[in-house]
Each structure stands twice: as C-alpha cells, then as structure tokens.
C-alpha cells in the first residue's frame, strides 16, 4: 500500500527545499524524494557562486547605484526578447519576479540569516541601446557564503520540520512515473536505489534495490534541467545558434539529467521554449574534476582581448561580461566551438574570478581576512593561480610569438597567425594612451572603472597588453560550458502546470529549472544573471504556499 502525505516534492535542490519548507511551515505534511543521497541536499545551488539579482538594494545605494523597478523591468524585457504566444505566462512571471527582487526578496532572506557581500557585481552589461540586452547598472549580489550560504537557511528549516515530523526526506528514491486518477496527479512511483556514500557532485550508482509508491493531494516537480545530459542538450540545440558544439564541458553534475522532465511531459504536462538554453562560452576544464567533464566558468572583467578560433577579435559589443548568448551565437558561426582570451598577469590578478562555491574558499568560508587578500595579493586569487599553473586550457609565455605558437599547438591546428594577432593587439594598445578613444572595448573599460565596485576589485588599470611590465602574457582556450535550461513546464503564478489542452492539471506543480524558473521560461532568450537562484526561490515559494492552501 502506498504511503500517503499531503504534498510530494520531487527534487531536493533549492526550489524543492523552498517549496517543502513553505508547506511544512503551513502545518502540512510533505515528503521530499530525490534520486541522489543526503550528501547532495541543495542540488546545483550548493555549487553556485550564490549570485542574486536584487533591485534598489541597500548594497547598491551605498555604492551610489540608482536603480528602480522600472529600470530593471526595462532591462529584463529588453533582454528576454519575448516573441511567442508561449511567452504569455513567462512575461507575467517576469513582471512578478522583478517586483519581488525590488521588494521583499532581500528582507525575506535576511530574516532567515542570509547575508550579502557588500560589493555588487555588474554581469551581462549589454552594449546595445537602452531598450536592448543587459543590466543598465550592477545588480549581481553575491551571497556571503556563496552557494552553501543560500542553501543553508532552507536546509535548516527543512531539518527542523523533519524533526517535528512535518517533513520527510526519501533520498535514493528515483521517480519513474506520476500517478493520475480521474485527471488529477495524486502521487509518484519509482525505484529505490542502493545507498551510495559517494562524494557530493560525483556520479552515484543506479543500482535498484526496491520500489516505492507515494500518494498525495499535490506533486511539485523540482527536478532541475538537462545541463548534465549532453545528448539532450544537442537534441534541443536551436538552429539559430548553428550546429551544436562537438566538444562541451559540464557546469553541473551528471545527475542533472532531464529525466524527470520527460516523465512529467509523458503525464501530459506542457513543455514550452525547450530550444532556449543558457550555456557559457568562458568554460575551462577543471584540472581537479568532481563530476564527469567538469568545467568551470571564468567570470571575467572587461579587459581581456577576445579572439575566435581563427584569431579574429570578437566584434563590438561582444566583450567579456557583455552578452553571453550573442557571444555563443558568434562563436558557433565561425565553424569552431572554442575561442581565446589573451591577457596579462595584471589583468588576471584583478579581473578573473571563477564561478562556483568550491572555487571561492574565501567567500564560501565567510573569511573577511582571506577575501581582503584579493585586493592586496601580488597574484590572482589562489584558485585562479592554480588553474594558471595546472589547467590544460592555460598558456603562459613572456613573448607573443611563443604564446601564439603554443596556442596553435594546444588547439591542434595552425589557424592562428602571429602577424594577424599582433596587429590587432597593437592597434588596441595604441588606444590606451587617452581616456577618450574610439575602441569600444577600451571605452567599456573606462566606463567600468567609473563604478567604484569595479575599480576596487574587478577592473585592472588600463595598460598595453604587450607592455612587459604587466606580463607575462596569458592565453586561455575557452570552451562551451553547459549550464541552464531556460524553457520548462508552462505554469501560472501559483506554479500550477498546464496540460497540452491549455488547462491546469489538477495536483501538479513545477518549480525552478523544470519550470524555466517560472512560467516555462521567465528569462526568455537571455538572463541578466543572479536570476536562476532567484527563480528557484520565487517559484518554490509560490508553489509551496499555493499547494499548502489547496490541500486539506
């Protein structure tokens, strides 16, 4: 006989934890099932940089940033590019989410003990016009404690609810089907997997030791996206971005396999915008990998010169940190699936950060002493220097001819011509003498340094790339890094899932990445960053509160 509860949550990542704790706090019983072990509680969010999109925050105001709901919504709509009938609910979610980010989001988190690093980052800067893609102002608020710091309040609440008997975890329970009675989703069934104490993030076994069935008045799908499943990524790769990359690295663990998306779709849920994905172009292969094909994203400042595989500088405004999707489209149009940064030691010292909690021990460990060393150390942060020394994608040389020769050797071809690259670097270097120039990237550097946060810790003083005083020269081979699924199950503002016939499926909810972070694609085609964790928080909260009101 199936065990019964009020609500079942499929997935113990951030959105699932948020939904489950809201349900438990409302006095309802909830069971959280996940195919991974307890050590993976928090899912992808644990590995994140902990960035949150906030609007008109105290942190922004202290840095002299003037922001507003109206400006943020203008940026969001210009970035999303909503252009389909399917975008009706994503647009509603976008307006509601920006209001959340400009309203109670920060205070809600702060009441649970969440804290923010005081310097606000400026991600996805765009470079088009006021109504186009990008953040007009810095909005990327890093959680003090990075990914674990955003998971902790909800894990704590979940464990407290578990102690009181309102919440039950069922780890190593893999859902294989949703049960439906008279058109209402009322449970799940699947396989019990053998215990596996593998380290968090590493691939766990799929050995089946039993089966299970659970019944409830509502089921919330919080199972994540497809970023760990390269086959699915390639299947969904849009024609507008050219052929899918032959070589990709993974920004998420292997268990982010998209399996539950197929199971939920089979039950009649409407999946929309499946061709919209968010994959990074600044991926580097992890020299100390945790999961298969483990990649890390460089979070670059504005100064590195960016070249495609043939040695041609990327066109304006495709500079570091400007337009991820535009960069991906351009790179794939070259016929190659990689590109290059060329920079100096002075640039890497101040401008290279690595995404991920494990790559930022100072912020993750909440150590002010270690964090302050970023501004005072002679070298780059220790994890960056480790990649420079051990990473297969990094090349360090004193002379440009030696650097280019090594780049060709690493790529296994002869595409790069020294004179072509030297001409472009020297032309850029001539623009450095004045603070007013025509080179759009150099203008971008000067603009960045007008913001105190960038000037302090994220943007190097303008200098010539070929100036030996700022050497050695560094080249980084950049790979395509899989990450987020932007499409998902179509949901209303209560996270209730629509069926293929256009009506809500009773008893079924979807949250987080499985719901395109809200509505089936709250981001449209592009993200402003800091919005994925936020989408998990907002959609999970909405679903948990709505489901708690619905169940008896």
Predicted regions and their residues:
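Beta1/beta-strand and adjacent pyrophosphate-binding region of the FAD-binding site
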Residues: 2-15
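Glycine-rich FAD pyrophosphate-binding loop
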Residues: 25-46
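N-terminal glycine-rich dinucleotide-binding loop that anchors FAD/FMN and/or NAD(P) in oxidoreductases
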Residues: 46-76
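Rossmann-like flavin
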Residues: 65-133, 399-427
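Conserved redox-cofactor binding core of oxidoreductases
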Residues: 94-212, 230-233, 284, 425-469
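Glycine-rich loop(s) and the adjacent beta-strand/alpha-helix scaffold that form part
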Residues: 196-287, 529, 533-542
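An anion/pyrophosphate-binding glycine-rich loop and adjacent beta-alpha core
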Residues: 261-263, 267-409, 413-416, 420
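A glycine-rich dinucleotide-binding beta-alpha-beta segment and adjacent secondary-structure elements
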Residues: 413-518, 522, 526
């Amino acid at each position: 006989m199936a065990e019964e509860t009020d609500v079942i949550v499929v997935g113990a990542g951030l959105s699932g934890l948020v939904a489950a704790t809201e349900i438990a706090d409302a006095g309802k019983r909830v069971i959280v099932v996940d195919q991974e072990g307890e050590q993976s509680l928090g899912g992808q969010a644990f590995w994140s940089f902990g960035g949150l999109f906030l609007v008109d925050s105290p942190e922004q105001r202290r840095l002299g940033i003037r922001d507003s709901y109206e400006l943020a919504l203008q940026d969001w709509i210009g970035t999303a590019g909503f252009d389909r009938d399917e975008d009706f609910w994503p647009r509603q979610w976008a307006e509601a989410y920006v209001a959340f980010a400009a309203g109670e989001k920060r205070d809600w988190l702060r009441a649970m003990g969440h804290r923010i690093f005081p310097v606000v980052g400026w991600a996805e800067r765009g470079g088009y016009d006021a109504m186009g893609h990008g953040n007009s102002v810095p909005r990327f608020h890093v959680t003090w404690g990075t990914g674990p710091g955003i998971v902790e309040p909800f894990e704590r609440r979940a464990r407290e609810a578990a102690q009181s008997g309102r919440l039950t975890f069922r780890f190593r329970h893999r859902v294989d089907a949703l049960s439906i009675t008279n058109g209402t989703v009322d449970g799940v069934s699947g396989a019990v997997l053998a215990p596996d104490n593998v380290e968090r993030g590493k691939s766990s076994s799929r050995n089946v030791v039993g089966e299970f069935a659970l019944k409830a008045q509502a089921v919330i799908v919080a199972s994540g996206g497809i970023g760990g499943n390269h086959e699915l990524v390639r299947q969904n790769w849009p024609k507008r971005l050219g052929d899918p990359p032959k070589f990709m690295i993974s920004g998420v663990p292997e268990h982010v396999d998209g399996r539950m998306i197929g199971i939920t779709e089979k039950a009649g849920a409407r999946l929309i915008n499946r061709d919209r994905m968010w994959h990074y172009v600044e991926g580097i292969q992890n020299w100390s990998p945790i999961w298969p094909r483990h990649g890390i994203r460089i979070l670059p400042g504005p100064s590195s010169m960016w070249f495609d595989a043939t040695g041609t500088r990327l066109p304006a405004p495709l500079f570091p940190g400007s337009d991820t999707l535009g960069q991906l489209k351009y790179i794939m149009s070259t016929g190659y699936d990689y590109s290059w940064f060329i920079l100096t030691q002075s640039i890497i010292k101040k401008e290279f950060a690595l995404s991920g909690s494990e790559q930022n021990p100072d912020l993750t460990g909440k150590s002010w002493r270690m964090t302050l060393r970023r501004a005072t150390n002679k070298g780059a942060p220790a994890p960056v220097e480790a990649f420079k020394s051990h990473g297969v994608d990094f090349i360090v040389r004193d002379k440009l001819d030696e650097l280019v020769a090594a780049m060709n050797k690493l790529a296994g071809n002869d595409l790069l011509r020294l004179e072509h690259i030297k001409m472009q670097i020297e032309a850029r270097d001539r623009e450095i003498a004045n603070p007013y120039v025509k080179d759009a990237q150099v203008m971008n550097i000067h603009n960045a340094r007008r913001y105190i946060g960038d000037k302090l810790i994220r943007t190097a003083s303008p200098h010539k790339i070929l100036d030996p005083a700022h050497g050695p020269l560094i080249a980084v081979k950049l790979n395509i890094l899989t990450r987020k699924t932007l499409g998902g199950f179509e949901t209303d503002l209560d996270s209730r899932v629509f069926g293929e016939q256009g009506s809500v499926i009773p008893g079924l909810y979807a949250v987080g990445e499985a719901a395109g972070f809200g509505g089936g694609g709250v981001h449209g085609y592009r993200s402003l960053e800091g919005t994925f964790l936020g989408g998990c928080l907002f959609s999970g909260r909405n679903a948990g509160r709505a489901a708690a009101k619905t169940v008896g």
